[in-house]
Amino acid sequence: MAGRLHVEVRLQDGVIRAVDTRLQRPLPQISRLLVGQTAEAALRRLPLLFGLCAAAQQVAALRALERAAGWAAIAEVEEGRTRLGELESIRESLLRLVQVWELPVPLERLKALLALCRRAAARLQALTAFRAAPLPADAELEGTLAALAAAWADLQPPAPADWLRPRLDRWQEVALGGPPPQAFTADELPALLAQLRASDARAEIAGQPRLGGPAASAGAQATASAQIEQHVGALLRRTAQAIDSLQSPPAPPAVAGLAAGEGVGLARTARGWLLHRVCLDDGAVGTWQLLAPTDWNFHADGPLRRRLCGVRVAAGEVEALLRELILALDPCVAFEVKIVHA
């Protein structure tokens, strides 16, 4: 099911006076399709509902459902699932870097990297079963992961400024406004969980937006040029970190204080942490909530509004600037922009 992002900017006398960010996501419809299903049936439906980050959606859902059912996957299973999510993140990040940001990678090398990701993911697919058993030692998987790490090391991608300079120079004189929201941290999970239990699934903490993933690590830069460069650099660094983590996958953040029949699952995507919360009632789904990185990064009071309000930019440049900044924040849905001249 596809969502859509709408961003409207009001420009007056060469200054951005207002930014309206509206993210439309079919989360209530998705929830209705899953409520009433058994865990196994819900997991069979998930791949039909999500295109991007499909593996991460599956992993987060599995973790939530198994926790709600009172079953804890052993460390080897969790490590394999984390690897599966990271392989998807690597693949999606590479495609984004090449297709959107024109990372200069020879086509044959890109194809080889993507093929290694697919081959390794196929060896881990059995772990997407509910209450999956650990996989036997797999020399082919380990060899594929080693080949992926070697291929990435051999690639030696340049710094974003080296290949993006003509694209960035256009925005060197555009000074951005106030600071973006704070980054979401694992310490805030209890507060978020309390909100979700109260049927408040907004991507905020105590009424305040947060940032996640590469968007959070990019920081607040003075100019639009520097901000875009840092976002692309953060995505590049995240890709390298994901490849490194395949050798020793980290455990997902622990979620304490869950009630009987309640489960929360987290999975890292190319854009940040994905969260599913599930409640089971007599073995059937009673509640299903999810928050994705795009929900956080495109909050109505998020980085677009905070960084763009009050910014001076030529009328003929504002749409192109807006599109570049949206692409830098990397939404997982299609978007459209509208410029209103006051």
UniProtKB/Swiss-Prot annotation:
It holds the Pfam family NiFeSe_Hases. InterPro entries: Ni-dep_hyd_lsu, NiFe-Hase_large, NiFe/NiFeSe_hydrgnase_LSU. GO terms for molecular function: nickel cation binding. PANTHER family: HYDROGENASE EXPRESSION_FORMATION PROTEIN HUPK, HYDROGENASE-2 LARGE CHAIN. Belongs to the HupK family. This is Hydrogenase expression/formation protein HupK. It comes from Azotobacter vinelandii.
